[in-house]
């Protein structure tokens, strides 16, 4: 009886071409591992983005270049651990580019503050002014809501549920964009600064909202600054987010097809006027949604590269 002691780290081969991506965007890699892995995925600083074994025998890992990560700190590493606990680490080569974001000024009127008093009191019951409540919600509640999105992001299918370009709200005009650097003013005084993390789309009031792609509803309830919020999982960490809805017309666990109506636009949460705040999440991190509305971007950045890697076997 002889016991084989495994001390060899797993061998990993990346099969996809070197991805080009800009700050705030997403890319994907496909790779093979020489033995069964107990964990594998991309490590970026403190963040870990898991990979999923596909029917073609390759692991697919989608990961973001987060908006708040400086280009010099964007050094993704492929971390793989085998069943015996041996680890291999490989630097993932990426062509990372910068992106310029707009600066935007929002005037927060007393009318707006008064119209939202009930919402504010529910989120921050303390005995303070509506303005103080607003600033606290825009900071503390926002941070707490973003942590919830990271938790929701863990609830993802191990296979791709979506296909093709994502569908935008029909007949909608683009308002605020992803990455807008916002300065909040009240009566001529600066009260706050935040970054806008989605794409605001405005159509008519209470416009029906289509599911942007096929997937499964993983969240459908009010959440802080977002108001009535629906999150659809599309697999491999990719999710779409729909917020400020006046009405949610779906529920958790529902399977949706691209174009299925999931609710109506509205002004819930911190919204001023009736609109849809549309977001894309990658493992719970908010990324550039416009990429996913663009069939050429999806083909060049994601699907062609994954298809070529699968065909190479």
What are these regions (language model features)?
Residues 1-11:
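Proline/serine/threonine-rich low-complexity linkers at boundaries of modular beta-sandwich domains
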Residues 165-312:
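Catalytic cores of peptidoglycan-degrading enzymes
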Residues 9-15, 209:
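Proline-enriched interdomain boundary motifs that mark the N-terminal boundary
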Residues 19, 64-66, 189:
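Outer-membrane beta-barrel proteins
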Residues 16-22:
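Short beta-strand segments of immunoglobulin-like
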Residues 26-33, 39-177:
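Non-catalytic extracellular/periplasmic "stalk"
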Residues 10, 36-40, 228:
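Short beta-strand/loop motifs in extracellular/secreted proteins, especially
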């Amino acid at each position: 009886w002889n016991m084989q002691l495994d001390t060899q780290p797993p061998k990993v081969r990346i099969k996809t071409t070197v991805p080009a991506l800009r700050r705030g965007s997403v890319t994907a890699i496909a790779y093979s591992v020489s033995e069964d892995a107990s964990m594998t995925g991309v490590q970026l600083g403190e963040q870990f983005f898991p990979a999923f074994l596909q029917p073609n025998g390759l692991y697919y890992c989608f990961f973001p270049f987060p908006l708040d990560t400086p280009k010099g700190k964007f050094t993704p590493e492929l971390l793989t651990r085998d069943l015996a606990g041996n680890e291999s680490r490989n630097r993932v080569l990426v062509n990372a580019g910068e992106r310029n974001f707009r600066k935007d000024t929002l005037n927060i009127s007393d009318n707006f503050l008064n119209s939202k008093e009930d919402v504010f009191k529910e989120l921050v019951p303390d005995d303070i002014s509506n303005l103080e409540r607003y600033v606290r919600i825009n900071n503390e509640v926002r941070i707490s809501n973003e942590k919830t999105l990271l938790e929701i992001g863990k609830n993802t299918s191990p296979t791709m549920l979506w296909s093709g370009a994502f569908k935008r709200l029909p007949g909608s005009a683009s308002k605020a964009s992803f990455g807008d650097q916002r300065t909040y003013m009240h009566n001529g005084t600066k009260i706050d600064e935040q970054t806008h993390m989605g794409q605001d789309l405005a159509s008519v009031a209470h416009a029906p909202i289509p599911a942007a792609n096929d997937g499964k509803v993983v969240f459908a309830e009010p959440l802080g600054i977002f108001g009535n919020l629906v999150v659809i999982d599309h697999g491999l960490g990719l999710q779409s987010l729909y917020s400020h809805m006046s009405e949610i017309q779906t529920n958790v666990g529902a399977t949706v097809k691209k174009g299925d109506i999931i609710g109506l636009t509205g002004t819930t949460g911190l919204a001023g006027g009736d609109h849809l705040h549309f977001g894309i999440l990658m493992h719970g991190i908010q990324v550039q949604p416009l990429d996913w509305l663009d069939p050429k971007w999806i083909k060049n950045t994601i699907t062609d590269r994954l298809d070529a890697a699968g065909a190479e076997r």
